[in-house]
Each structure stands twice: as structure tokens, then as C-alpha cells.
Amino acid sequence: MILGLVAAGCKKKVAPVSERIAKAWTAESVKHGATVVYTRGGSGNIEAAYSGFRLTLTNSGGTKTVSLTDVDAKTFTGNWDLEGDTKLVLTNLTPAPTGSGGKLEFTINSIDDAKVVLTRLTASPKTGGTINEYTLTNP
């Protein structure tokens, strides 16, 4: 009984999503709708340009900033925040991504220390109006 209590007391505390997500992420795989268009290291990628995709989320003294380099190699900067633990919101993006009004929203499907899976909540004009899913890793 005592051994069980000691073992239970030694569990590693899981950092909040706001801490785990604040890092530089690169694309491991990307889906446009149900179609996988990019897999890191893949030879038959439909959208090989995702090799340059980068989402960098920083939190410095409570100031949350984002830099997003998209599939077309354009970089957008702004702010980010979470709504609960399941929604990532990028705001004040400059220049504003096409049709976004400077705001992009993603569902956080899953997250751990080295991987996050995000689904964009609105269709992307850049990818023919698809809802895209991004599996991102760090490093």
C-alpha cells in the first residue's frame, strides 16, 4: 500500500498546453481534406514545399507572439492565444493571409512535448478551399 502511494506521488507533472505548445514546430505530415499531400522524407509528396512550413509560438513574459511560414514560403507574424486547451487562435497576422482578416483558428487534436496535431477551422484559399490538418513536430 505504501509503495503504491509513493509511486503515485512520483508521477511527472504534465505542463499546461500553453507551455507545451510554445515552441518552433515543423511539418511532419499535412492533409488537405482527406488527402495526405506531404510527409517529411517522402518521395512522392504532392506539396513538397511543406518542407519549409514553420509555426513558431513564443511566450515571453506573457507576450505571446507567432511567426508562421506557410506552404508558399510567405511569413506572417502576429499574436497567439488558446481558447481552453483545444483551440489555437492566431491574431493580428501581418500581412493578413488571404481571406483571413488577419486571424487563423485551429483545433488542437492532440499535443505532447514533441508533436502537435492541428486542424484549421476554416477552409484555406491557398489549397483550393480544403480544411487542412497539420502534424507538426519539435525539433
Give residue spans per PLM region:
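Sec-dependent bacterial lipoprotein signal peptides
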Residues: 1-12
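Lipid interaction determinants
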Residues: 11-77, 83-139
